[in-house]
């Protein structure tokens, strides 16, 4: 029996920490997708960077091998939901952004399906075990949902939200977050 595998970082932080435009853009993404910290953005950027690197390396291959590997990569990205059409090319892969990947996170899809009122509530429901994918509890908001699984997202069987979904908070007298009885 060997030693356990060394865990490595899944992300790479920006080279220069204080670029105003990048900081503003990242703050916008944090709010839009309900992310906990900028590391989640950097993880998405690293994943997209890896796919783009694979696509660029395809361009150097001989045409026969390139066609096979391109079909495999496009198939994987179609299954993940990052590409929309089967006739996608290397150019489509090179034009992917981190927003495309953030749209495929479980947290975002739970919010867009209407199972939660906000992206932050979606994150809380997932972490507390109220959300299931294909009947199995998933507690990771960063779970990348495949296209096949997208329609199988629902409340977990024993969740209290199954019978009574979250009610949209009503504003009364300017107070946010007060629920009406």
Curated annotation (Swiss-Prot):
> What does the entry give for GO biological process?
ribosomal small subunit biogenesis; translation
Q: What is this protein called?
A: Small ribosomal subunit protein uS4
Functional note? One of the primary rRNA binding proteins, it binds directly to 16S rRNA where it nucleates assembly of the body of the 30S subunit. With S5 and S12 plays an important role in translational accuracy.
Which SMART domains does the record match to this protein? Ribosomal_S4 (SM01390), S4 (SM00363)
An example GO CC term for this entry is: small ribosomal subunit
Q: Which InterPro entries match?
A: Ribosomal_uS4, Ribosomal_uS4_arc, Ribosomal_uS4_CS, Ribosomal_uS4_euk/arc, Ribosomal_uS4_N, S4_RNA-bd, S4_RNA-bd_sf
Pfam families (alphabetical): Ribosomal_S4, S4
- Keywords carried by this UniProt record: Ribonucleoprotein, Ribosomal protein, RNA-binding, rRNA-binding
Q: Could you say which protein family the record assigns here? A: Belongs to the universal ribosomal protein uS4 family.
Subunit record text: Part of the 30S ribosomal subunit. Contacts protein S5. The interaction surface between S4 and S5 is involved in control of translational fidelity.
Q: Which GO terms describe its molecular function?
A: rRNA binding; structural constituent of ribosome
What species is given as this protein's source? Saccharolobus islandicus (strain L.S.2.15 / Lassen #1)
The family database entries (Gene3D superfamilies) matched by this protein are listed as: RNA-binding S4 domain (3.10.290.10)
Which positions fall inside the S4 RNA-binding domain? Answer: 104-166
Give yes or no: UniProt keyword Ribosomal protein.
yes
- Taxonomic superkingdom: Archaea
């Amino acid at each position: 029996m060997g030693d356990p595998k060394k865990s490595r970082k899944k992300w790479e932080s920006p080279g220069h920490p204080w670029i105003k435009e990048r900081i503003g853009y990242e703050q916008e993404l944090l709010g839009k997708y309900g992310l906990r910290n900028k590391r989640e953005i950097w993880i998405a950027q690293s994943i997209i960077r890896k796919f783009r690197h694979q696509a660029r390396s395809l361009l150097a291959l001989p045409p026969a091998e390139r066609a096979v590997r391109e079909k495999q990569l496009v198939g994987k990205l179609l299954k993940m939901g990052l590409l929309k059409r089967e006739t996608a090319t290397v150019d489509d892969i090179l034009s992917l952004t981190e927003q495309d990947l953030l749209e495929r996170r479980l947290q975002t899809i739970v919010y867009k399906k209407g199972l939660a009122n906000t992206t932050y509530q979606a994150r809380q429901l997932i972490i507390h075990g109220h959300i299931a994918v294909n009947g199995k509890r998933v507690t990771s908001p960063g779970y990348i949902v495949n296209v096949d699984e997208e329609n199988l997202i629902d409340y977990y069987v024993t969740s209290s939200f199954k019978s009574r979904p979250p009610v949209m908070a009503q504003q009364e007298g300017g107070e946010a977050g007060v629920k009406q009885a």
